[in-house]
Amino acid sequence: MPTIQQLIRNKRQPIENRTKSPALKGCPQRRGVCTRVYTTTPKKPNSALRKIARVRLTSGFEITAYIPGIGHNLQEHSVVLVRGGRVKDLPGVRYHIIRGTLDAVGVKDRQQGRSKYGVKKSK
């Protein structure tokens, strides 16, 4: 606990909040090009093959982004839109690819939660 004299000499420094998605540079989304599309396994206790992509963003960063939904058409050189948001059981994956924009098509036969997977309303 500082004394009053110490506080007069130098005031308390505010804690600076670090951003959880620095590659977006304050933007809501960023465009990028896939450099590698592959699968990886999650941390314990989960088990799956999660689809992820290495993406080179327009901000110059090379990031790892998660591809949500069942099935995708992404491959190397696909242009994608990336948003923030981590995947809890994949260490180092702090971004999501937005489905239904640019080269990432929406999830096929999706009926519920369509807006999150870029699917138009079926008639």
From Swiss-Prot:
It is found in: Plastid, Chloroplast. GO terms for cellular component: chloroplast; small ribosomal subunit. Keywords: Chloroplast, Plastid, Ribonucleoprotein, Ribosomal protein, RNA-binding, rRNA-binding. GO terms for biological process: translation. InterPro entries: NA-bd_OB-fold, Ribosomal_uS12, Ribosomal_uS12_bac. It comes from the Eukaryota. GO terms for molecular function: rRNA binding; structural constituent of ribosome. Part of the 30S ribosomal subunit. Belongs to the universal ribosomal protein uS12 family. With S4 and S5 plays an important role in translational accuracy. Located at the interface of the 30S and 50S subunits. This is Small ribosomal subunit protein uS12c.
